[in-house]
């Protein structure tokens, strides 16, 4: 009887560790993908205002793709992350999109910085640390 309890406890512990590891990997991979896309977007006001319309349309398409990737993954992410971190990323993505499409580039750059910080925080919160464990 005691052996059975040890085996069941061990199996549950392995499943728990596997689940936590998968969540950390998933959040890390999605956040890294989004950060790579954001770093490819323009980051200087002087550069943006001098862009030709075709290049602006290309960046709009990239921002739409970023939004689609977030939408596709957000349902899973909201289950495993802190709500405040999730909402910060969500809000920054929509702000980034709206300000760029409205040609309000100074606000777009602010939202871009917020989004980078929010994604990095979300990514770091999934790493094993004393704070996350206790």
Please describe what each predicted stretch is.
Residues 27-44:
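Alpha-helical transmembrane signal-anchor/signal-peptide segments
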Residues 95-134:
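Non-cytosolic head/periplasmic domains of membrane-anchored proteins
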Residues 8-22:
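Hydrophobic membrane-insertion alpha-helices, especially the h-region
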Residues 45-58, 96, 100-107:
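Short helix-adjacent coil turns
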Residues 45, 61-72:
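Short N-proximal segments of mature Sec-exported proteins
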Residues 67-88:
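Short, solvent-exposed, charged loop/turn and helix-capping segments
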Residues 1-7:
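N-terminal positive-inside, membrane-proximal cytosolic segments immediately preceding the first
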Residues 56-64, 83-91, 109-114:
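Short, charged, amphipathic alpha-helical segments
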């Amino acid at each position: 009887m005691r052996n059975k309890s040890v085996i069941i406890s061990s199996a549950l512990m392995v499943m728990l560790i596997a689940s936590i590891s998968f969540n950390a990997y998933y959040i890390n991979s999605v956040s890294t993908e989004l950060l790579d896309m954001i770093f490819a977007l323009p980051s200087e006001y002087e550069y943006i205002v001098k862009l030709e319309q075709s290049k602006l349309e290309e960046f709009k398409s990239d921002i739409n793709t970023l939004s689609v990737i977030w939408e596709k993954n957000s349902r899973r992410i909201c289950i495993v992350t802190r709500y405040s971190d999730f909402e910060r990323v969500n809000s920054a993505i929509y702000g980034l999109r709206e300000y760029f499409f409205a040609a309000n580039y100074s606000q777009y750059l602010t939202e871009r910085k917020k989004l980078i910080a929010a994604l990095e925080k979300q990514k770091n919160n999934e790493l094993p640390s004393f704070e996350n464990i206790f």
